[in-house]
Design a protein with these regions (language model features):
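Active-site rim helix/loop that mediates acceptor-substrate recognition in acyltransferases
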Residues: 32-66, 197-218, 222-229, 234
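Glycine-rich phosphate/pyrophosphate-binding loop shared by adenosine-nucleotide-utilizing enzymes
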Residues: 68-74
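Conserved beta-strand-loop-alpha-helix junction that forms the acyl-donor binding cleft
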Residues: 117-130, 141-147
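Conserved acetyl-CoA-binding loop-helix of GNAT-fold acetyltransferases
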Residues: 93-106
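Short amphipathic alpha-helix that is part of the acyltransferase structural core
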Residues: 2-46, 64, 162-197
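Conserved hydrophobic beta-strand within the GNAT/NAT acetyltransferase core sheet
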Residues: 82-85, 116-120
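Conserved acetyl-CoA binding element of GNAT-fold acetyltransferases
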Residues: 78-90
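Short hydrophobic/aromatic beta-strand element in the GNAT-like acyltransferase core
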Residues: 58-62, 74, 84
């Protein structure tokens, strides 16, 4: 009979993504230096001061390998600004980069930040970011910037009158030129509630990085074909109507009635 006293495999912890700790920094520096000396493509040792500052500011995320307990990837920028994502060479091709991106997406969603932006560095990373759903911004400065708009759906209340909503975003020149084509036109369904608020079934967003020439973007809202407002998003009057600022642009979840004067 086979022995029942075979040694059990050692249990290993699960790999985790978390904020960096002091003990993570030396191992990261060590493998960055080793890969830089070996000429590994896509090494960010040259940005060490940026990485160290992100750690100090508690903005550095690390992927801790469950078997070794060591950091084998890191990310800074949280996909809300140009940042860095690097995976240790011998851990590439295992989906770690994809997991780091998904983690950052969830962080952004929890903060109600649906407009993501990155810089694809090195340029060989462009296919990866495109697979992650990012779109390159033509002629961007710095080059190879890319953006992504996360979808956010809302459950409409049972009460209220169904309405059709169209939101348009224009460049600043719409303020003085009527014959100006909208940069973005998006439609949504909604419910007009007893208090006059119109709740949309999805978030309507405008990503500033995707349209750098828009300058002070102008927003127009129509409900059942009737214009509700058209003006610069930054104006207080529009923000009272539901135009909301986020890190990388603007969004509308609901249209509020005009305040009585």
């Amino acid at each position: 009979m086979p022995s029942t006293n075979q040694p059990k495999a050692l249990a290993t912890s699960r790999s985790v993504i978390r904020r960096s700790k002091a003990e993570d920094i030396a191992p990261i520096r060590s493998w960055l230096e080793a890969e830089d000396a070996a000429g590994v493509h896509g090494n960010f040792l040259c940005n060490w001061s940026v990485i160290a500052r992100a750690h100090k500011d508690q903005e550095l995320l690390v992927y801790i390998d469950g078997k070794t307990g060591l950091p084998v990837a890191f990310q800074l920028g949280r996909l809300l600004q140009s940042g860095i994502l690097q995976v240790k060479q011998d851990f590439r091709g295992r989906g770690i980069g994809k997991k780091m991106v998904a983690y950052c997406v969830n962080l952004a969603r929890r903060k109600s930040e649906d407009l993501l932006v990155i810089q694809c560095k090195p340029s060989s990373s462009i296919p990866f970011w495109q697979r992650m759903g990012f779109t390159l911004i033509p002629d961007s400065d710095p080059p190879n910037k890319a953006y992504k708009v996360l979808e956010r759906r809302h459950d409409l209340p049972a009460v209220g009158k169904p309405v059709d909503v169209v939101i348009r975003f224009y460049p600043e020149e719409r303020k003085w030129r009527d014959a100006c084509t909208a940069l973005v036109q998006l439609a949504a369904s909604g419910k007009e509630l007893p208090d006059g608020v119109i709740q949309l079934d999805r978030r309507i967003s405008f990503h500033e990085d995707a349209y750098p020439l828009a300058r002070d973007v102008v927003v127009e809202a129509e409900v059942n074909g009737v214009r509700q407002f058209i003006d610069k998003a930054k104006y207080r009057e529009l923000q009272q109507r539901g135009v909301t600022r986020c890190r990388n642009g603007w969004f509308i979840d609901q249209i509020r009635p005009e305040e009585s004067r």
